[in-house]
């Protein structure tokens, strides 16, 4: 009976077949210890001289890393074995042998080497754990919104304009010289969806032509972007907190083994799963950053009216044991579509959610302008071509209502939950300013 490693605990004292690859091998006297991987996990298999045909024992002594195998044996519970179980091998069959020396041996390798061989590095424990957690987060995102009655709404990747009027766009030439751009966000289209279906979410790749070499930036990354009709700024933040606490709790519940592989202490994530995220206004956050800057020379002062940089976000987020909201920024440093604060029109009803431990922003959201004339004026103030946004203005001409939404960056969220130093490890094949291969 063929089984997978992630279900091995259900087959103790049973004869099973595993199909996979040799990850590591060592020998001690009359025992060969084979660490097998099958895409669902890693398992120790023991080949004992005298318990298998001599030809099988000799074969096991000369298997190179990444040999593809079929292995038959009995599952045993053994606390000494990695994962608490092992396979007592009865027989094995080589399906294929590596053609040459496998590049990623047991010695230490630098990150550039590993990224050059990303197509092979994905087979190893660390990327395995990260991708399993990423997969769990994606599944949980769909479950979260599906259970709350949201419609999955697919936004186009080719768009005629930028969402926020930025120049950081990848341009694509279409037919007859017409130009389009790779989407930076599905938000504008999600707004159309929300006014048709009340509550929607988009989930897909987005593109930013940023010449950034920071640990938080990719050229291509994934975002989930919900949008809800009649939702206020306060309700928007409540939904963000509910989502993030749900995601963290799901990983703690189902991916503790992978967190252990990464050396990530689950206790560091438990406060985030509980909710109760602090809220700071932009003004309060600037004051806190400047107090920190007086104590820490690595944190630059932040004049009021400027946006937070990575050092500011990191310094702020380290003061909290769970994500923290920063809300109500000056309108002049935020996007044209954000609703002004009725208590102070110089501010907007927006928020950023910063992950703790120095990870910084993982969510940006706002209440959107729903008044036609105000939105038209903002488009003009930002120097944007009104004809490109005419369809977007239609959303305000016909049945306009207050509405809100946000975008959660998947890779930044994965990096925080996994405790990664760089977002390049949070996506299978990262696309960065300095890397486009493999």
Curated annotation (Swiss-Prot):
Catalytic activity from the UniProt record: tRNA(Asn) + L-asparagine + ATP = L-asparaginyl-tRNA(Asn) + AMP + diphosphate + H(+)
Annotated localization: Cytoplasm
GO cellular component, one term: cytoplasm
Gene Ontology molecular function, alphabetical: asparagine-tRNA ligase activity; ATP binding; nucleic acid binding
Entry keyword annotation includes Transcription regulation: no
GO biological process: asparaginyl-tRNA aminoacylation
PROSITE patterns referenced in this protein's UniProt entry, alphabetically: AA_TRNA_LIGASE_II
Coiled coil stretches, renumbered: none
Superkingdom of the organism of origin: Bacteria
Keywords of this entry: Aminoacyl-tRNA synthetase, ATP-binding, Cytoplasm, Ligase, Nucleotide-binding, Protein biosynthesis
Subunit record text: Homodimer.
Family: Belongs to the class-II aminoacyl-tRNA synthetase family.
Protein's name in the database: Asparagine--tRNA ligase
Native organism: Thermus thermophilus (strain ATCC BAA-163 / DSM 7039 / HB27)
Gene label: asnS
């Amino acid at each position: 009976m063929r089984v997978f490693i992630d279900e091995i605990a259900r087959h103790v004292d049973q004869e099973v077949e595993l199909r996979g690859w040799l990850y590591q091998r060592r020998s001690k006297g009359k025992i060969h210890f084979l660490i097998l991987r099958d895409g669902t996990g890693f398992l120790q298999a023991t080949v004992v001289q005298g318990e298998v045909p001599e030809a099988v024992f000799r074969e096991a002594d000369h298997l190179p890393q990444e040999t593809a195998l079929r292995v038959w044996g009995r599952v045993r519970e053994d606390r000494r074995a990695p994962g608490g179980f092992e396979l007592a091998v009865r027989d094995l069959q080589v399906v294929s042998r590596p053609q040459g020396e496998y590049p990623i041996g047991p010695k230490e390798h630098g990150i550039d080497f590993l990224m050059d061989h990303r197509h092979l590095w994905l087979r190893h424990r660390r990327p395995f754990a990260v991708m399993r957690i990423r997969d769990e987060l994606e599944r949980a995102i769909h479950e979260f919104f599906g259970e709350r009655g949201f419609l999955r709404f697919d936004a186009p990747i080719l768009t005629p304009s930028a969402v926020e009027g930025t120049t950081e766009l990848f341009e694509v030439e279409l037919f007859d010289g017409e130009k389009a751009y790779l989407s930076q966000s599905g938000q504008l289209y999600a707004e159309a969806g929300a006014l048709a279906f009340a509550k929607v979410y988009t989930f897909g790749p987005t593109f930013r032509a940023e010449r950034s070499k920071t640990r938080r930036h990719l050229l291509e990354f994934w975002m989930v972007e919900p949008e809800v009709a009649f939702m206020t700024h306060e309700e928007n933040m409540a939904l963000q907190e509910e989502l993030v606490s749900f995601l963290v709790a799901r990983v703690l519940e189902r991916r503790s083994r992978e967190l252990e592989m990464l050396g990530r202490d689950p206790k560091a994530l438990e406060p985030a799963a509980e909710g109760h995220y602090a809220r700071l206004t932009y003004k309060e956050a600037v004051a806190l950053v400047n107090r920190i800057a007086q104590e820490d020379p690595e944190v630059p002062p932040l004049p009021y009216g400027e946006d937070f940089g990575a050092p500011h976000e990191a310094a702020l987020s380290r003061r909290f044991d769970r994500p923290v909201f920063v809300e109500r920024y000056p309108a002049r440093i935020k996007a044209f579509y954000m609703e002004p604060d009725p208590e102070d029109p110089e501010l907007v009803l927006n928020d950023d959610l910063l992950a703790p431990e120095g990870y910084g922003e993982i969510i940006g959201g706002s209440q959107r302008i729903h008044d036609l004339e105000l939105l038209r004026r903002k488009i003009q103030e930002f120097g944007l071509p009104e004809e490109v946004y005419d369809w977007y203005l239609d959303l305000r001409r016909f049945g306009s209502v207050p509405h809100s939404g946000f975008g959660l960056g998947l890779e930044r969220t994965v990096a925080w939950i996994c405790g990664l130093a760089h977002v390049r490890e949070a996506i299978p094949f990262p696309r960065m300013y300095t890397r486009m291969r493999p």
